[in-house]
Amino acid sequence: MFQVKKPNIDELKETLKLLLMFREEFSDVYPEADIGKVAITIQEHFDNGFISNAYLDGVLVGSVGAMETEWWFSKEKFLAETWLYILPKYRTFKIVRGLLKKMK
C-alpha cells in the first residue's frame, strides 16, 4: 500500500536515516553531511515548516521538506523546497507526484 503523510515525532529518526542516504548516494558531488545539522533542519521543518514522507507497504521510501519564505523581490510568500529525496529503487512518477501534491 502506498501512503504519503506528515511523519509523527517518533518517525523523525527514520526520516533522518533516509536523508543521510542522500549523502551516501551523492558523495562524489556534495560535502559530508553533518548529522546534527540534518537533525536540526528536520526538527525545524517539523515544528515550523512542512515535511511529508512516502511509505510503500509501511517502509519509508521518500521525503520532501519545505519552508514558507518570501520572494526576494516581494513580500508575498511561497513554499520553498529544502529537500526531495526518494530511494533509487522507488523513483517513480507515482511516488514523486504523491510527495509534491502534498506541498500544495
Predicted segment positions?
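Short amphipathic alpha-helix that is part of the acyltransferase structural core
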Residues: 1-34
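Short, basic/aromatic recognition patches
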Residues: 37-41
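A short helix-loop-beta-strand connector motif used in the catalytic cores of GNAT acetyltransferases and
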Residues: 42-53
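Conserved beta-strand in the GNAT
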Residues: 53, 59-68
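A conserved beta-turn-beta hairpin within the catalytic core of GNAT-like acetyltransferases
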Residues: 70-81
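A short, internal acetyl-CoA/4′-phosphopantetheine-binding micro-motif in the GNAT/acyltransferase core
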Residues: 82-93
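Conserved acyl-CoA
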Residues: 98-104
